[in-house]
Amino acid sequence: MGDDVRVTWRRVRESWARSAAIELPLAVPAQPPAPGCLRVAFLVYRGNPQCGGQGVYTRHLTRELVAMGHSVTVFAGQPWPQLDPGVGFVPLPGLDLYRDPDPFRIPHPRELHDLAAAVELGVMLTAGFGEPLAFSMRARRVLRSRRGQFDLVHDNQCLGTGMLGILGDGWPLLTTLHHPITVDRQLALGHATTPWQRATTRRWFGFLRMQTRVARRLPAIVTVSRSSATDIAAQMGVAPERMTVVPVGVDHTVFRPQPDVAAVPGRLMVTSSSDVPMKGLVPLLEALSLLRADRDVELVVVGKPREGGRVDRAIERLGLRDVVRCVSGISDEELARCYAQAQVAIVPSLYEGFSLPAIEAMACGVPVVATTGGALPEVVGRSGETGVLVPPNDPLALARAIAGLLDDPAARARLGAAGRDRVLDRFTWQVTAMGTAACYRALLDTGPPEGGRGVRGGRHRPQVAPCATDRSLVTSAAKGAPC
């Protein structure tokens, strides 16, 4: 017992030392807006693109908005975002309680300098996730000190209670809701095997009550697929007329075919930003085990499965250590090269609100095998034409689809080319930015938020058409805007 206490205390002190050594990034001023363009405060509570789709969305959308002439300042918590030149940045540091190498750390008392920090720690100590609430409190406080500096606020799925305060302070607020996290909770509960796991899972997802309550009161929501819009309305009770579908995109100058890079025979690739049941890695590993019975295959996992977690245990149980390789922390250019070296890319998710990995692979000209979970059919397209679709959580169907492509070079080439054409036609960040900017204009044309005090700063805003919900309308609305 005494040894355990000493070890714990040593780890706490080591964590404190690491915290003391961390230097906060400097704020970066935003590029001023072009005439007639907007000043946007963009909020993201977790901004690093290597931690998930929210960070990728933040980086590429803000870059394209700035290219259109808008001025964008990103207010972000840890892990910090990667931003392009011209995009402003204001760090809103939290306690970063889940960082490597000391997740669920106990912060030094000096770090508890405000109510938001106390809330963040208190929620973690009761097995919950307090980052969205704490970040929304910090964001509201900072925006109160910047009245008149922005025309609107864009929240990237924080949905903390502080967002209602931001609305009440008079800020026009647009929110991106990628998909309802209620789906994540349902899948996590379905994979919990003990009463304790079910109890802790419910507690961890306790923030969903707050997000649902906030979402129902938001004036304007952007979501990324028709599937997500349907699920948000059904599971969170958001009025459909408040939602607009603007798909996300891919940087097709980075994610492109590389004819000088040879695909490795039998190599498969999957990208997974988190080690959770929803990503479907265990069914994919079971499919890989079936494929090994009559062929040489290997799987590259772009992600970091948790040591001793479900994926790690499945690799061990199925005897796949020698054919599964995990890589993480790589650049977009390195990721594109990984796609080029694969014969088939797989998206085995049980559910996706969109799927950046699917369109990244398609943009690279790599044939995709995906499930029908969530928005994947909407993204990948018709099975057999621009990709191959199979039921979710079906290892045998996955194995058969993958084997069919591995055995048919002509089909791989045909689907790869058709997939890239589909992405270039529908899913680029330029289209995403134009559609988002059209939604900004529509929001501002509605006047100050109900109960707000009007802090926009008096800038003239030309009129535009209402937000569109498909690519052709999004493009035409954006082209009609002066920016």
Please tell me what each predicted stretch does.
Residues 102-126, 167-212:
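Acceptor-binding helix/loop patch of EC 2.4 sugar-transfer enzymes
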Residues 350:
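Aromatic "clamp/platform" in nucleotide-sugar-dependent glycosyltransferases that forms part
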Residues 382-383, 388-395, 404-409:
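Conserved acidic donor-binding segment of nucleotide-sugar-dependent glycosyltransferases
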Residues 227, 249:
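Carbohydrate-associated surface elements
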Residues 261-288, 300:
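Conserved donor-binding/catalytic core segment of Leloir-type glycosyltransferases
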Residues 311-333:
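Nucleotide-activated donor-binding/catalytic signature segment of Leloir-type glycosyltransferases, i.e.
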Residues 367-370:
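Short hydrophobic beta-strand element within catalytic cores of glycosyltransferases
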Residues 2-20, 26-37, 75-138:
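A conserved catalytic-core segment of Leloir-type glycosyltransferases
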